[in-house]
Amino acid sequence: MRLRHKPYAMDRINEYSHIVIGNPEERAGSWKEVFGNEQPIHIEVGTGRGRFMYDMAKANPHINYIGIEKFTSVVVDALDKLIEEELPNLKLINKDAEDLTVFFAKGEIDRVYLNFSDPWPKKRHTKRRLTYKTFLRNYEEVLVEGGEIHFKTDNQGLFEYSLMSMAEYGMLLTYLSLDLHNSDFEGNIMTEYEEKFSSKGHRIYRVEAKYRTEPMQ
């Protein structure tokens, strides 16, 4: 996907620095102070234009959310939603998720969302997939003990790879759907991509995976 350059993006982001948090590494261990409360914190890695995080934050004011998106021209669209209607329980980070363990202290996050991540289908790009073992290790480091990953995609190959990667890492798969929109799952909040792909008849895959608190026997 070609991203359209938006020359105003950085100025807009800098103007609303209370929403798009600059230097997030300086906030590690103090995100509850940023939000001003003790509510649990959920993050989305690759938040895109922010529809999912926005709708989640609006539906769940008792939870704090942070959307992480590395592309400035994309995260500014998420910011524009919040300029129109600011939600006190939603912040954004315009950085690469590879640095996740620098942004958050150990055990600071309660849940990680991965929605319609780039599948990186070529074998030589396997390490870039957000469910590759190094990313799983980073999520585990910032999550509370027994923390969860909730993952959705329309890409069967990526889904199968992710199930294998999570299982090999020793995670527990606590929920699995091979056709989310025709399942009994309640309360699904869609992303922009999810709405687009499902309207074309694409099957949506979903898994919830939990880190073990005790080593496998």
From Swiss-Prot:
S-adenosyl-L-methionine binds at residues 44, 69, 96, 118. The keyword NADP does not apply. Pathway: tRNA modification; N(7)-methylguanine-tRNA biosynthesis. GO terms for biological process: RNA (guanine-N7)-methylation; tRNA methylation. PROSITE patterns: SAM_MT_TRMB. It catalyses: guanosine(46) in tRNA + S-adenosyl-L-methionine = N(7)-methylguanosine(46) in tRNA + S-adenosyl-L-homocysteine. GO terms for cellular component: tRNA methyltransferase complex. This is tRNA (guanine-N(7)-)-methyltransferase. The gene is trmB.
